[in-house]
Swiss-Prot record:
Disulfide bonds join C106-C181. The gene is TACR2. InterPro entries: GPCR_Rhodpsn (IPR000276), GPCR_Rhodpsn_7TM (IPR017452), Neurokn_rcpt (IPR001681), NK2_rcpt (IPR000913). This is Substance-K receptor. Residues 57-69, 130-149, 219-251, 311-384 are cytoplasmic. One of its GO terms (cellular component) is sperm midpiece. Gene3D superfamilies: Rhodopsin 7-helix transmembrane proteins. A lipid is attached at C324 (S-palmitoyl cysteine). Glycans are attached at N11, N19. Keywords: Cell membrane, Disulfide bond, G-protein coupled receptor, Glycoprotein, Lipoprotein, Membrane, Palmitate, Receptor, Transducer, Transmembrane, Transmembrane helix. Its main location: membrane. Belongs to the G-protein coupled receptor 1 family. GO terms for molecular function: substance K receptor activity.
């Protein structure tokens, strides 16, 4: 690829053609730059405030500290960091075609975005796996608190390892007086290495986890909506519990679909560049990239909105978090939603070969956090 790398994001750059002397000037009118800056600023603010609030709601209230919610915290943290460190700085780079932030941040910028995206989608995958075990195999041992922390740490370590090659080959170059942050793959096989690496990354951080989640939620949906136990009718607390499960699954499916839709055009854009690399030299491509990059980064701000709209506890949490706003009036019920722990009752269902626990309310936070074995014991997680 030549020097036309303006809209290849810093962390997805190509090899350097040291003999290239021409450079494509990408500029836009001031009013257009102001509109883009406003759009990206709004995105960052909504994502940072929303995800920070989600983290506070879960960590500050003992009732919310379930295994599933710890994965949601991990997802929110990754999205918050993605919006803060990737959206803002890469917008500046893409809109000016000059790297202002130094060599150290160039390394970081080629390491962190892939890391954060991997953490985001595999946190969603972990939630799908946890729900699969709870609903499809309710009597199998569940993740404990230490086990959950180990999974989260493992996700971050694998993500860093996957992103390391780009960081390793990162460098700062000068192109006719303009500073660029690029990834300089080895000259003898740079094009092949770049394509292979991008295909591997896209497969691991997009297609593979989406397939896993599709299968998991399909089986869960079949279990909840199709499967019935002969002679057993769901009513009362059990019916509420079943409805909570269904609502949780719908919420997480919406989160996954939103992520997939936001990121697909962005991945296709870079795959297209491998087979038609002169497209990056065309004037219109800057605007195309800014649209696709905004769409991809916007995935970081939708989850808090989805939680608030579809889950009453998160809605109560948001009202408490923004109670200083004159148009927000939290109630005592909002406080109880996040602090009160309903009682637990037990009875035996003779339709099964094993004794089954049925919840009147939610499981105690300590039990949920410790991931006690048995499906019904994670009842609180279905309601977040």
């Amino acid at each position: 690829m030549g020097a036309c790398d303006i809209v290849t994001e810093a962390n997805i750059s190509s090899d350097i053609d040291s003999n290239a002397t021409g450079v494509t000037a990408f500029s836009m009118p001031g009013w257009q730059l102001a509109l883009w800056a406003t759009a990206y600023l709004a995105l960052v603010l909504v994502a940072v405030v929303g995800n920070a609030t989600v983290i506070w709601i879960i960590l500050a209230h003992r009732r919310m500290r379930t295994v599933t919610n710890y994965f949601i915290v991990n997802l929110a943290l990754a999205d918050l960091c993605m919006a803060t460190f990737n959206a803002a700085f890469n917008f500046v780079y893409a809109s000016h075609n000059i790297w202002y932030f130094g060599r150290a941040f160039c390394y970081f910028q080629n390491l962190f975005p892939i890391t954060a995206m991997f953490v985001s989608i595999y946190s969603m995958t972990a939630i799908a796996a946890d729900r699969y075990m709870a609903i499809v195999h309710p009597f199998q041992p569940r993740l404990s608190g230490p086990g959950t922390k180990a999974v989260i740490a493992g996700i971050w370590l694998v993500a860093l390892a996957l992103a390391f090659p780009q960081c390793f080959y990162s460098t700062i170059t000068m192109d006719q007086g303009a500073t660029k942050c690029v990834v300089a793959w080895p000259e003898d096989s740079g094009g092949k290495m770049l394509l292979l690496y991008h295909l591997t990354v896209i497969a691991l951080i997009y297609f593979l986890p989406l397939v896993v989640m599709f299968v998991a939620y399909s089986v869960i949906g079949f279990k909840l909506w199709r499967r019935t136990v002969p002679g057993h009718q769901t009513h009362g607390a059990n019916l509420r519990h079943l409805r909570a499960k269904k609502k949780f699954v719908k919420t997480m499916v919406l989160v996954v679909v939103t992520f997939a839709v936001c990121w697909l055009p962005y991945h296709l854009y870079f795959l297209l560049g491998h087979f038609q690399d002169d497209i990056y030299c065309r004037k219109f491509i800057q605007q195309v990239y800014l649209v696709l990059f905004w769409l991809a980064m916007s995935s970081t701000m939708y989850n808090p909105i989805i939680y608030c709209c579809l889950n009453h506890r998160f809605r109560s949490g948001f009202r408490l978090a923004f109670r200083c706003c004159p148009w927000v009036t939290p109630t005592e019920e909002d406080k109880l939603e996040l602090t009160h722990t309903p009682s637990l009752s037990v009875r035996v269902n003779r339709c099964h070969t094993k004794e089954t626990l049925f919840l009147v309310g939610d499981v105690a936070p300590s039990e949920a956090a410790n991931g006690q074995a048995g499906g019904p014991q994670d009842g609180g997680a279905y309601d977040f």
